[in-house]
Design a protein with these regions (language model features):
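Structural recognition of alpha->loop->beta junctions
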Residues: 10-32, 118, 143-151
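Short catalytic-loop micro-motif centered on adjacent basic/acidic residues
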Residues: 1-3, 22-25, 123-124
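Acidic, glycine-enriched loop/beta-strand segments at the rims
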Residues: 132, 147-152, 162-197
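Divalent metal-coordination and catalytic microenvironments
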Residues: 23, 47, 126, 141, ...
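Divalent metal-binding pocket/active-site signature
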Residues: 1-15, 53-54, 105
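Short aromatic-centered micro-motifs
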Residues: 200
Length: 256
């Protein structure tokens, strides 16, 4: 377990000086200068900026809700009730691009500066939206100027080393566990290709990402989610029209 900085810059720097394993959540100051980069870069203290809930400005989460139609993501809707997705995504907070440039993207540029000075950066998505949050965090880290390869390392070997599991996972090497993500497109060409997952191999079993059914040597369909179970008293029909849960009222709009 590692503590977070709590959006307090002086607390963050004290954590670095004290030799904490890492700082969770971004520091609320951007940009930073040589005093911070040299101190942090020589400390071996990790950094998990969690831009998706960016301290000190607009969150990256708002950016990706604004820039993508989340309610149209068919794969996401396989694993999350539509009422939950609609309520989070169809009514969006909108902001000018320059506001994001001065908020989570500026923070991401500071992350890149720290990485260039020796700080190991890790990807952590805060659990904002299972299925997309990790991708959004990855793409947000990339917005700061890291190369595609550097960005991918934050989600793989850097994070594995950070939690003490780097000898077992985090890279494809002889002797490590064969837990593998199989993508349709190469994220080294476009970082958003991280979202083209075909198969997940974990603990010697392979799963189809579109259905979560086990495939390969021992095919086995997954069990139904609670909202797919015929014995479940549903409060809404499953996968109806995308606007079917919007209840307009005289004084505004309400949604599940």
């Amino acid at each position: 377990m590692v503590p977070e900085g709590g959006s307090n810059f002086f607390h963050n720097m004290t954590m670095v000086i004290d030799g904490h394993t890492g700082v969770e959540h971004n520091i609320p100051v951007a940009p930073v200068y040589k005093d911070v980069t040299e101190l942090w870069g020589t400390s071996k203290v990790g950094y998990t900026p969690t831009l998706i809930v960016n301290y000190g400005g607009l969150n990256a989460e708002y950016y990706w809700y604004q820039k993508t139609n989340v309610w149209e993501n068919k794969k996401l809707l396989q694993f999350t009730p539509r009422a939950i997705i609609d309520s989070r995504s169809r009514y969006r907070m909108m902001a000018p691009d320059e506001d994001y440039e001065n908020d989570h993207i500026l923070t991401s540029k500071t992350v890149k500066n720290l990485a260039d000075n020796g700080v190991k950066i890790n990807m952590g998505a805060h659990g904002q939206l299972q299925g997309m949050g990790a991708h959004w965090e990855l793409w947000s880290i990339h917005q700061g100027g890291m190369s595609n390869l550097e960005t991918l390392k934050t989600a793989t070997i850097n994070s594995a080393n950070y939690i003490g599991a780097g000898k077992d996972i985090g890279s494809l090497e002889k002797g490590k566990l064969a837990d593998i993500l199989v993508l349709e497109k190469n994220p080294l060409d476009d970082i958003q290709n991280s979202n083209t997952l075909l198969y997940t191999i974990a603990n010697g079993r392979m799963y189809d990402s579109a259905s979560m059914n086990e495939v390969g040597n021992e095919p086995k369909p997954r069990k139904k989610f609670y909202w797919e179970n015929s014995n479940y008293n549903v409060s809404f029909p499953w996968h109806e029209e995308s606007d079917s849960f919007m209840y307009h009222q005289c004084c505004g709009a309400m949604h599940n």
